[in-house]
Amino acid sequence: MAGHDFVIKADDLSSPQTGALIALHLQGMAQNTPQEHVYALDKSGLRADNIRVWSVWDGDRIAAVGALKQLSDTQGEIKSMRAHPDFCGKGAGKLLLLHIIAQSKQDGMTRLSLETGCHPDFEPALTLYRRCGFLPGAAFGDYHAGEHNQFFHLNL
């Protein structure tokens, strides 16, 4: 994107900026979704063996964070996608989502899924997912469909 020199990095969650962006993500989930329907992971949850986290940086500033949870040899789940407010609409989230999709293909996955909320604040993310080919579909894994969540899938 013009004016930005984004770099994607594998993220071990040790950076204070990454921690702050994850905290902002969790705060947003709590504000827009009843707590019993929030499935966002905190830093300890994102450290699971089957989860990889990446972040997008513009110089020394974090622009976005996102994760890939391996559900099986062929299916993955997008987790904790969040752009920093200063970088919303600047392409960092799209760059990261495309990176996760490419990594999933490289890993031999054939399907990516995600669970997200229904509040209007989720609309920018939903637009991004749709533009990248994700389609609405059924609940997956241990999720249950309800009035506060929705599910999207991408066949790779």
Where are each of the predicted segments found?
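Conserved beta-strand-loop-alpha-helix junction that forms the acyl-donor binding cleft
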Residues: 114-125, 143-147
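Acetyl-CoA-dependent GNAT
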Residues: 3-75, 79, 84, 97-98, ...
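Conserved GNAT acetyl-CoA-binding A-motif
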Residues: 104-117
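Short hydrophobic/aromatic beta-strand or adjacent loop that forms the aromatic wall/cage
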Residues: 51, 147-151
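Conserved acetyl-CoA-binding loop-helix of GNAT-fold acetyltransferases
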Residues: 83, 89-102, 127-131
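A generic structural signal for beta-strand entry/edge sites
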Residues: 73-75, 111, 149
